[in-house]
A protein has these predicted regions:
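Short, amphipathic alpha-helical interaction segments positioned at domain boundaries
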Residues: 133-172
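Winged helix-turn-helix DNA-binding recognition segment
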Residues: 55, 72-128
Length: 184
């Protein structure tokens, strides 16, 4: 499969944008290579968020907690949870039960396999690591987890293939470990 170079794609998109919005100044756009304060997120994030909310019990907006964690993470996917009040607010929770609601969502994300939490000086919720969401969803699908519909999973797979998300096709870490042990 021959891929079009990114520069060529970028030029095509820039040319189209200029034709559609000739009065638009490039200074009005967000440039991740110019401004600080950005993070990389999977292009499948909207689908991931929908799946998380489908899997979370009740009408919880667990996906907003997940997105807030991504907003705090760097490439190491580690998040300090030292300021629970702030993280709860960023997740959309206010009032007396804000931190409690946030902690419930954090537990749900950990239970579903999207994050891992570690205790420390701030108590039970001191540190978090964000796991590969595609792997988490693939595991949930393989386990037949209620709430993960075929339509949602297939949409994620389709989008993953369309954007070249190799982690939708490669063996999961535990599968690679089993293969390595079997080869011994």
């Amino acid at each position: 499969m021959v891929r079009t170079p990114k520069k060529k794609i970028s030029k095509k998109v820039t040319d189209l944008r200029t034709r559609l919005w000739p009065d638009l100044s490039p200074d009005d756009l967000w440039h991740r290579n110019v401004y600080d304060g950005f993070t990389s997120v999977p292009r499948t994030m909207p689908l991931i968020m929908n799946i998380i909310d489908d899997l979370a019990p009740g009408s919880k907006r667990t996906s907003m907690t997940y997105l807030a964690l991504w907003g705090q993470a760097f490439d190491e996917m580690y998040v300090s949870l030292q300021n629970a009040d702030e993280l709860a607010f960023h997740s959309g929770y206010t009032g007396q039960r804000a931190v409690r609601s946030w902690k419930e969502r954090m537990r749900e994300l950990a239970k579903l396999g999207f994050i891992r939490i570690a205790a420390g000086t701030a108590g039970e919720f001191s540190h978090a690591v964000i796991l590969n969401p595609h792997f988490a969803i693939r595991r949930l699908h393989a386990a037949g987890t209620p709430g993960l519909t075929a339509a949602a999973y297939n949409a994620l797979v389709e989008r993953g293939i369309a954007i070249g998300a190799e982690d939708m096709n490669v063996a999961l870490p535990e599968e690679r470990q089993e293969e390595a042990e079997a080869a011994k």
